[in-house]
Every structure is written in structure tokens, then in C-alpha cells.
């Protein structure tokens, strides 16, 4: 798909770099900071010594590894230390994790580079040059973030290099001890081994290794791996089973109080007045406080007040009893219907930003010679909540010129910044403890709850305060997955070949909102997430155009598991099925024709179809193929329909994610992604009426239950390619696979999410 690239795209890239460069003073003349050694020491205790910025070792041989990413079920507490253990030649059981300090070497470079608007097939100088420059910028920014299915991809080189360097230092120390050449020594199971049978434990060499000069540092080859590529048990499972795992809501600093909030029910509303006299007499109530002015702009948390009490139940009951009057503000008439109408109007009037162009779509749409049929369709997707099992929470203490924060956050860097700002201290005086996350899905990339908690704690006379949102607070004050509207048009010749493919969509921009509220950047320019999965797809057409119109609304939006792929995969894979039907071709055969130049994608599709076999009587198989975060996923959904009820019995999920670091975790993430995507496909919808979110809890924002969960079969294709993301790629293909199966069964094309047959003619 190497069509002509527009000058606008280059302006977008270079303009984006200019904005990013403006954040960094002199990044162009400062050598990039290496990722091996940082400026902040590792938080090691006892007799442990640091061998580099990532790795420390104790006298007993325990290896301490810095953990810069948040564990929210995706398995980083297992997969990332595997990289160090592999290169150090130590058992995984010998590794303990320590929270990475707020240092630039732990910044997520891969996530920022993945945000560039390049097609996977691009191999030109522009892509390589821009990627190189963005890498330099990313190193200087040092944003510590967990998201974008980037943890393994980003850590693959620096954490292996850290382990290999530590091993080389230990070998050098042993060579000095034995007065021999380091080249003749080898390592295994936490020991340096001499050819004559002598061995020294790493722990015994730790102190001397600190000053050792490593010789050649060589990373292992694929065939030398002993841990990587083999199933390893999850390190976090025992603590989750026995109850010792610490999530945000489990933080218990001495003297802790609790806080509950009352937030404006109308988006953008403010507090008019509060009468707290009666509430202050309620059992356990300590204080009623206002946190106005502390929140980032246009975030999930709404304006309001908080009640501080001696238990959460006391705080929540008092918050509900507060007599609060609200100023509804300018969004009191906002509705989902009005937002979709605005999308449609803008699509009618504006061309939007062209993310990809090939050939001449205008000529094809003008009924050029050979056009036998035109297919048009309009698709839509709703706002979605994150609905993580652990409710939004944060614990904070402001005392003696320091701010202590305990948070289940995906953005430690942003959390430190906002805690310092709201707490009135420097970032050096913020102590952040990142706990496990009971689900994140992108919601905890935002730090509105940290700002809120610190603002409340600042008024708690030095006591730590744990702020907890109820499920209703969470559902009605999320940063939602954007709603979207997409229009498709395609032309076919008499043989069913696609001559032209046009897609124009409309939605809000997550990036505009997110970077405004977290970095203060003014909104502007295109946003790759609005068109990802469309402009960079692997289907080839001689004439093609992918455009997007950004249409802002007052609804706060944020990153949601798989981001733009979550709806663009539904739009694209459903429309591809429509084209197969219009061409009179089998949907799988049609895709195979389109993937002739992409053997990896074709192999994934074939693997899923082969594993799925033939659908039983009364059921149908729907197919979808989508690439996101570097990973190719094909899914076959086995579906039945009874009346208007859609039932998904089985999903086969074939995956090419590059080298499979831990196949167990990959299979787990595939299963998780399928269930998460199925919840959105069948049930997920947040609607706005009179400026308020209408849904409040699982009774009206349901998720897939155990009796509704399909059997998930995962096929992991072998690969020696660089590891790619796995936390999100299994989510996007679910909805189109199910919708395509429903069409086979009923002849009804479902073009709106959530999927429903009610009222469909």
C-alpha cells in the first residue's frame, strides 16, 4: 500500500515534532541519554548494590530489577524480569522487583514512536529519520507510562542490555578473583563457572562487581534462550490468591482517613452552594472540603465537594446526604443525538485530514470506465466507559513539605507532576508508591483522581486520606472511549475486484484532550488514533482515500483498550465483508486475495480458519483480521441467533506478535481481550441526555458474565521477529467477527454498536 503521500502528512509529522521539541530545551544539541544508567539511584535496601540503573544484587544472590511499568493484569511483573533473568543467567525465582525511580531512562520510548502516522509498509527515509528524531525527543521527555501495548516492545533492548551488562560485570569480577581471562568463563543459575570446575555465586561477587569493567557485552541469540519463549508461571498469581497483593484500595498508611465525593451530574457543571451543617453531625464525619481549582482541564472528575470521615461507608453516606446546589452550565442540553448530528453535519461539509491517498478516488467515484457497482455504508460506535473492577481511588498525604501518594496509576510521571502542583511542592518532594492496578484499560493514564486526592489531603491536617469513587461515580465521570461515525464508499468492477475504497470518519480527538489536560499543550493538528487501523491496514486497492474530521464536544474522552482500533476494526472489517458479499465471493477467499502481498497476515488468517473448522448446524462463523500495536490477529467467532438474542459460543484467535516472550501470558491476554471486546460489542454504550451520562452501574452498563463467555482458543504463530504488543490487539476484531457471523445467519447487516437485532429490518 505504497500510494502517493500527501504533503499535508509531512506537515503533520514535522509540525508534531515542532510541538514536541518545544517541550525540551536544547534536545537537538544534547546527546541522547543512554538507558543503562540514570541520575536517580535504585531504591535498594540492606546489602544490595546497584550494577546499573536497572539491576541490583544482594549478597545472597537476589537480583533486584527496576519495574518501570504498572501491573494491571497484563503480566509485566513476569515478562519484564524474564528479560533480565535471561541475560544474567539467573532463575526467575531469584529476581525481586523494585519500583523504578522517576528517571528518564525508564521513559516509554516505544509508545511515543508508535504514535507516528506511518503505515507498517513504509520503509522510506522520512519514516526512519522521523523515528530517530522522536526517539531522541522521547529519551529527553522520559515519560514513564504504561499503555499502547508497549511494555515488552520498549523493554526488549534496555532490560536485556541491563542484564547482560550486569552479567559481564560479575564475570569480570570473577576473572579478577581467579586471575584469569574473562573470555574463558561461563555463567549458569546465578554462578560464574571456571573450566576447572570452580564456581562463584553472584552474591559473593556483588561488591567487587560494582567497580568491575565489563568486557564485551553480548546479547543472547534466539537459540540460546532458556526462559524467553517458554511458558513461565505468573509471579503475581500467589499474592493475588492469598490476598497479600497490594492494589491502590489496599493502601493503609497509619492514621488514614477516607474521602467520598459528590460531583456535578452535568458535564462541566459547577458547585453553586453547599450546606454541610447536618452532615458534619453524622457519625465519623471529620470535614467537608472543596477541591475546586485542583482538577486538570476537561477530565473525568467533575467539580464538587468531598467528605472526609473515619470510614469509607461513613464518608459515602455523608456525601450522599450533602445538600448541594449545582450550576449546570452550558452543557445542560447536551445529548448523544446532538453529538451524532454534529458528526454528520461536519462529514457533509468538511473534507477532513487525509491520512492516506493512493490513485485517484475522485475519478473512480465519477464512474470511471470499468465501474460496475458502488457500495456505500455508514457505521457508528458509541462512547464507552472503562468499567475496571477496582474503582477509581488514590491515597495521599500532605505533611511537612512533602506529598506522599499511593496510586494504581498507569502514568507515574504525570502523577508526580500533578501531585507536586496541587500539593504546592517540588517534584523532588513527592513520594509516589505505584500499587497493582485492578484493571486499567487506559482510564488510569489520566491522573484526575490524584489531583482530587491531593487537594482533599491538603485540607486533612496531615492525615493520609484515601479517596474512593463508587461505581456510580466511576461510570458517570469517566474519560470515555470516543463515539464515532464513519462513511464508506467502494467501487467494484464486473469481476468483483475493488477499484476504489473511500472512508471518511468523524469523532473527537483523544490526543487533543489528553495532552491538553496533562501537558498543557494546545489542541491542534491531526490525531493518528482517530484513523488507526484504517489508514494503515494491509488490504491493497488501486485507488484509496482515508480521511478523518475531528469534531470536538464537551464530553471528556480518553484512551480505552485498543483506542481507535476498537471501533475502526469494526467499521473496516464489517465493510470488507460487505464488499465480499457484493462481489459474490466467500469472505475468507476475498481477504486472501487482498492479502497476497502480505504473507504474515495471510498465515494468521489461514491459521484461525483452519483451527475453527466448520460451524455446527444452526451456527455460523464470522471472520475478522486486524493489526494493531504491531500484532496481527485473526478471529473466527462461532455465533447463533435465537429471536433477537445473539450468542457467541466460541472464538478462535490466531496471533502473530513477533517472538512470543511468554506464551502463557499471550494466551491470557487473548482471552481477556476477547471478553473485553465482546462486552463492548454486545452491550457497551454510554449515552448522554440533558448533559448527564445516563448509565451508572452494571445494571445498565453490563459486561459479559460467566454464562455468556465464549470458549476462546488461541493459536500463537511461531516468529523470530521483534516482540510486539499483546495487551490490546485481541479486542478490536471481536465485534466485526460477531457481526459478520450474524449477517451469515440472518442476512441483516449490523452497522452500529452495540450489536442488536432489535428493530433491525
Where do the PLM segments sit?
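Cofactor-binding beta-sheet edge motifs in enzyme active sites
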Residues: 2-761
Amino acid at each position: 500500500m505504497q500510494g502517493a503521500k500527501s504533503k499535508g502528512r509531512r506537515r503533520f509529522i514535522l509540525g508534531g515534532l515542532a510541538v514536541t521539541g518545544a517541550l525540551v530545551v536544547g534536545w537537538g544539541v544534547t546527546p541522547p541519554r543512554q538507558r543503562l544508567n540514570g541520575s536517580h539511584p535504585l531504591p535498594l535496601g540492606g546489602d544490595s548494590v546497584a550494577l546499573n540503573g536497572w539491576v541490583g544484587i544482594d549478597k545472597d544472590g537476589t537480583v533486584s530489577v527496576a519495574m518501570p511499568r504498572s501491573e494491571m493484569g497484563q503480566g509485566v511483573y513476569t515478562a519484564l524480569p524474564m528479560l533480565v533473568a535471561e541475560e544474567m543467567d539467573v532463575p526467575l525465582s531469584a529476581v525481586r522487583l523494585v519500583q523504578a525511580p522517576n528517571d528518564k531512562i525508564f521513559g516509554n520510548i516505544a509508545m511515543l514512536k508508535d504514535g507516528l502516522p506511518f503505515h507498517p509498509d513504509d520503509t522510506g527515509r522520512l519514516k526512519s529519520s522521523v523515528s530517530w528524531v522522536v526517539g531522541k525527543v522521547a529519551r529527553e521527555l522520559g515519560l514513564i507510562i504504561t499503555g499502547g501495548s508497549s511494555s515488552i516492545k520498549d523493554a526488549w533492548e534496555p532490560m536485556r542490555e541491563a542484564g547482560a551488562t550486569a552479567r559481564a560485570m560479575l564475570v569480570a569480577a570473577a576473572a579478577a578473583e581467579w586471575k584469569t581471562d574473562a573470555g574463558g568463563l561461563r555463567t549458569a543459575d546465578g554462578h560464574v563457572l571456571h573450566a576447572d570446575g570452580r564456581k562463584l555465586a553472584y552474591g559473593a561477587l556483588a561488591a567487587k562487581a560494582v567497580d568491575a569493567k565489563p568486557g564485551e557485552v553480548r546479547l543472547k541469540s534466539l537459540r540460546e534462550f532458556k526462559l524467553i519463549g517458554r511458558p513461565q508461571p505468573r509471579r503475581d498469581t500467589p499474592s493475588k490468591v492469598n490476598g497479600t497483593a497490594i492494589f491502590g484500595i489496599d493502601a493503609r498508611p497509619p492514621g488514614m482517613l477516607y474521602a467520598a465525593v459528590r460531583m456535578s451530574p452535568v458535564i462541566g457543571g459547577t458547585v453553586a452552594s453547599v450546606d454541610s451543617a447536618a452532615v458534619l453531625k453524622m457519625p465519623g464525619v471529620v470535614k467537608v472540603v472543596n477541591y475546586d481549582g485542583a482538577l486538570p482541564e476537561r477530565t473525568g472528575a467533575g467539580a464538587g465537594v468531598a467528605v472526609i470521615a473515619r470510614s469509607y461507608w461513613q464518608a459515602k453516606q455523608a456525601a450522599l446526604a450533602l445538600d448541594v446546589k449545582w450550576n449546570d452550565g452550558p452543557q445542560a442540553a447536551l445529548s448523544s443525538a446532538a453529538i451524532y448530528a454534529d458528526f454528520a453535519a461536519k462529514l457533509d461539509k468538511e473534507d477532513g485530514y487525509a491520512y492516506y491517498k493512493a490513485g485517484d478516488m475522485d475519478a473512480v467515484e465519477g464512474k470511471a470506465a470499468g465501474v460496475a457497482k458502488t457500495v456505500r455504508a455508514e457505521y457508528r460506535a458509541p462512547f464507552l466507559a472503562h468499567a475496571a473492577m477496582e474503582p477509581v481511588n488514590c491515597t495521599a498525604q500532605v505533611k511537612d513539605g512533602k506529598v506522599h501518594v499511593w496510586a494504581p496509576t498507569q502514568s507515574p510521571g504525570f502523577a508526580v507532576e500533578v501531585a507536586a502542583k496541587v500539593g504546592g511542592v517540588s517534584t523532588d518532594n513527592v513520594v509516589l508508591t505505584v500499587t497493582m492496578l485492578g484493571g486499567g484499560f487506559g482510564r488510569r493514564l489520566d491522573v484526575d483522581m490524584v489531583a482530587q486526592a491531593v487537594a482533599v489531603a491538603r485540607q486533612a491536617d496531615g492525615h493520609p486520606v484515601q479517596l474512593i469513587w463508587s461505581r456510580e461515580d466511576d461510570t458517570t465521570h469517566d474519560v470515555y472511549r470516543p463515539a464515532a461515525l464513519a462513511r464508506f464508499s467502494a467501487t467494484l468492477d464486473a469481476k468483483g475486484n475493488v477499484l476504489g475504497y473511500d472512508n471518511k470518519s468523524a469523532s473527537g480527538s483523544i490526543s487533543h484532550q489528553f495532552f491538553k489536560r496533562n501537558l498543557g499543550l494546545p489542541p491542534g493538528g491531526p490525531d493518528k488514533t482517530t484513523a488507526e487501523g484504517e489508514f494503515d491496514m494491509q488490504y491493497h486497492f488501486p485507488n484509496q482515500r482515508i480521511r478523518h474530521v475531528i469534531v470536538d464536544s464537551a464530553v471528556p474522552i480518553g484512551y480505552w483498550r485498543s483506542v481507535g482500533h476498537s471501533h475502526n476494526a469494526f467499521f473496516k472489517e464489517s465493510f470488507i465483508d460487505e464488499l465480499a458479499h457484493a462481489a459474490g465471493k466467500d469472505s475468507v477467499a476475498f481477504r486472501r486475495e487482498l492479502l497476497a502481498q502480505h504473507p504474515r497476515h495471510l498465515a494468521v488468517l489461514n491459521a484461525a480458519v483452519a483451527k475453527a473448522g466448520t460451524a455446527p448446524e444452526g451456527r455460523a462463523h464470522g471472520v475478522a483480521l486486524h493489526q494493531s500495536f504491531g500484532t496481527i490477529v485473526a478471529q473466527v467467532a462461532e455465533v447463533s441467533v435465537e429471536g433477537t438474542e445473539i450468542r457467541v459460543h466460541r472464538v478462535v484467535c490466531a496471533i502473530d506478535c513477533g517472538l512470543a516472550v511468554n506464551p502463557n501470558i499471550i494466551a491470557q491476554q487473548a482471552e481477556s481481550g476477547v471478553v473485553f471486546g465482546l462486552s463492548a460489542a454486545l452491550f457497551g454504550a454510554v449515552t448522554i441526555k440533558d448533559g448527564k451520562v445516563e448509565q451508572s452501574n452494571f445494571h445498565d452498563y453490563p459486561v459479559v458474565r460467566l454464562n455468556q463467555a465464549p470458549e476462546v482458543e488461541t493459536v500463537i504463530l511461531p516468529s523470530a521477529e521483534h516482540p510486539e504488543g499483546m495487551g490490546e490487539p485481541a479486542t478490536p476484531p471481536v465485534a466485526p467477527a460477531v457481526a459478520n457471523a450474524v449477517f451469515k445467519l440472518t442476512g441483516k447487516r449490523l452497522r452500529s454498536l452495540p450489536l442488536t437485532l432489535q428493530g433491525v429490518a
